[in-house]
Amino acid sequence: RVLAPKRVIYIWLICAYNQLDYCAAWQRLWNYVREENLFAPEVEHICVYHDDPKVTEQDKLRTDVCLVLPRVGKPKGEVGVKEVPGGKYAVFRYQGPYENLRAVYDTIYAKWIPEKGYKLGDTPGFEKYLNHPDHTEPENLITEIYIPVQ
C-alpha cells in the first residue's frame, strides 16, 4: 500500500518495548491536544519503532508514541512534532494480544518478506492501534503493522 506522509505529535521513549508505558505517553499527548485545542474525529494512535530488538540492546530501543492529527501545534516540552514518511508499505492486520506481536514480526521478516521478494525500505515501520486495550479483550485487539518495503 502506498501511503501519504503523516503529521504527528509524539513523545520519544527509550527502553525495552515490553516495558514502555504506552497508555501514560498517550495520556500526555491527549493532554497536549486539549491544551492546544487540536481535537479532531480522525485521530490515529500509532507507534514508530526505530530499532530491531534482536540487534539493539533492550534498554536502548527507541520508540515514538504518536497521535496522527489533521493539524498539529508546535513542539512543547516532551511533545514533538514531525512527519512519519509516506511511501510503499506492506500492511498486516493482526487480531490478538499485544504479547504475541513479536511472533507476528518474526513470521513477517523470516518468511513473508523473503518469499514475496521484497526488500526492506529505509524508514522505520510502525503500528496502528484500531481499538483500546482498556475497552477491548486482549484476543480482540486489532493492530495494523506497517513495514516499509521496496
Language model region names:
Residues R1-Q150:
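A solvent-exposed interaction/effector surface
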